[in-house]
Amino acid sequence: MTLCAVESQLASGETARPGQAFFWLVSLLFSSLIWFTTATLIGNKDEPREKYLLIFGVLISVLIQEMFRFAYYKLLKKASEGLKTINPYEKAPSMRLLAYVSGLGFGIMSGVFSFVNTLSDSLGPGTVGIHGDPPQFFLYSAFMTLVITLLHVFWGIVFFDGCEKKKWYTLLVVLLSHLLVSALTLISPHYGLNLVLAYIIMVLMGVWAFFVSGGSCRSLKLCLLCQDKDFLLFNQRAR
Amino acid sequence: MLTFMASDSEEEVCDERTSLMSAESPTPRSCQDGRQGLEDGESAAQWRSQESEEDHEEEDPDRYVCSGVPGRPPGLEEELTLKYGAKHVIMLFVPVTLCMIVVVATIKSVRFYTEKNGQLIYTPFSEDTPSVGQRLLNSVLNTLIMISVIVTMTIFLVVLYKYRCYKFIHGWLIMSSLMLLFLFTYIYLGEVLKTYNVAMDYPTLFLTVWNFGAVGMVCIHWKGPLVLQQAYLIMISALMALVFIKYLPEWSAWVILGAISVYDLVAVLCPKGPLRMLVETAQERNEPIFPALIYSSAMVWTVGMAKLDPSSQGALQLPYDPEMEEDSYDSFGEPSYPDVFEPPLPGYPGEELEEEEERGVKLGLGDFIFYSVLVGKAAATGSGDWNTTLACFVAILIGLCLTLLLLAVFKKALPALPISITFGLIFYFSTDNLVRPFMDTLASHQLYI
């Protein structure tokens, strides 16, 4: 009974988002724990070592995030099944909706954590780039955060769909693209290249997610031309 | 809740409640109306839109009745329980979030609340000691004193309640809300004006504080629109939390938070715990527990109700601690009935049962206060780091989710503090010490994970 209750709460879309945000937070906690212990064990703090340690930390973090995404998927799956056994007539929230919401939760949490300190610093006095660093630091951070958030949403949709249809290569692709995006940020002084590549990846993932959630060229056309019966604007025009 | 909406005169309904609710009339479609009647303005709108969809699916008029009512099929009960869980989680997220936002915004902008200007008499030991051991000892001693004051106050309150000294209790509550609404608001307003360097003359100040306080007293202790009452309760919780954040020394605050959750667990779950006794006495007498001091997200009026049945106390009742409302300085009481419970289902026969509906959720003000103290302290002392504050915020919300879930499962008074505060403390310390260096290093190299 308790388990069913847990599951139903998670299965209802409303609590899925903070649930996933919490999972992201826990994944971040584990990855920083690993990074911290490794750093303490290794000991000395010379520059290249610190950089390698950081790269290691980033990779571990990406891995753990994807693991937690999978864990959340499993939890949601159990929840929907539990709900279905309790009440077979009730329409449970669809897995696609849950995928979107959970991706959003992940994305929001990740974006906020990356960006909020930068934001609060930007309110204070100072000149950006006075020591020779690029002056577009804030813009770059903002765009990067945006792309990461959107990417998490698309990754969530694609990931859950891959799990549902047992297409395991999908999970691998998501993991690799996440690693790619994070690795790209390592070449950080080259803002332009970094951002453009990240946006390209985002557009590709977005298109993939669109087709995976059941969209098609035809439905896109209907939507854009306001001829889609299910879409809001259609009802407006009919009046 | 619907019971007394139906029995009472319509005009009172129109005056006191939000316009959305007063528009509902108790028609024979009991379940639909009741459901609408019992929720607050925002969710009532949702129910309205869902009503048409749900019309065809509901054969069972008692579908949303509180589970446990005799005569209902067990599957239905489970389902109702689960429905309760998810919905009420959302209804509580908003006020808790608002309270925390107010506290964090104030802490981050108004310097007054982070300056050390002395301590409460309940925490006499200072933390300005040279050694770590001494500081720890002092904070533990402070905690012991504070907790014993709280326990004493709670027991005093329970004794008063048991011996039906209602006038005394009401007088006490009124005095403390007077103090909160007038004195603390005046101080708060003064500090905010100072921070933003806005000049305000005394007549305007007097008028503002007078209006604010008077309307607050009326809303909280008598009648007023639900939304306004909720807003005032959130504000006084925030003010109280700010006082705690200012006057509790650092380490003492963390130890007190931990100790309060343990106390809460004990007081609510042990058979002889004071909070449990309070709740049970209130249930035996079929009275709501000081409705003025619990945050409820649905109507809790008892006006005109000749005979209250326990069903009117709300499905998920989270009794608070009235003492919390009581002033912080002299009669600080126990932090919260952070209890969450569902009253035993009405043994009342007949039609009243049919009209039971999903009620709102109630959460004690003490819970609001301690959640906000945790998040506020994280904001004040977390090295100016927003990540810590956010992590604590998410942890508390998830703890609240889990607590509500347990409430839906166990259907009795449950403490709302332990799980949330535990998560909050774990996340505060781990984020501050582990995650912050990691994220800072990442940010300085502009890496994104």
Swiss-Prot record, chain B:
Query: Which residues does UniProt mark as catalytic?
Result: 264, 367
What EC number(s) does this enzyme carry? 3.4.23.-
Residue positions, PTM Phosphoserine? 22, 25, 30, 52
Q: Which residues lie within the membrane without crossing it?
A: 415-435
| Residues in compartment: Lumenal | 110-139, 189-201, 246-250, 384-389
Localization, per the record, is: Endoplasmic reticulum membrane; Golgi apparatus membrane
Segments of this protein annotated with the region Disordered? 1-71
Question: Biological process GO annotation list?
Answer: amyloid-beta formation; calcium ion homeostasis; intracellular signal transduction; membrane protein ectodomain proteolysis; mitochondrion-endoplasmic reticulum membrane tethering; Notch signaling pathway; protein processing; regulation of calcium import into the mitochondrion
Compositionally biased residues, Polar residues: 19-30
A molecular function (GO) held by this record is:
aspartic endopeptidase activity, intramembrane cleaving
Q: How does it sit in the membrane?
A: Multi-pass membrane protein
Q: What does this protein do?
A: Probable catalytic subunit of the gamma-secretase complex, an endoprotease complex that catalyzes the intramembrane cleavage of integral membrane proteins such as Notch receptors and APP (amyloid-beta precursor protein). Requires the other members of the gamma-secretase complex to have a protease activity. May play a role in intracellular signaling and gene expression or in linking chromatin to the nuclear membrane. May function in the cytoplasmic partitioning of proteins.
Q: Which family does it belong to?
A: Belongs to the peptidase A22A family.
The free-text domain note is: The PAL motif is required for normal active site conformation.
The protein's name: Presenilin-2
Q: What lineage is this protein's organism placed in?
A: Eukaryota, Metazoa, Chordata, Craniata, Vertebrata
Q: What is the gene called?
A: PSEN2
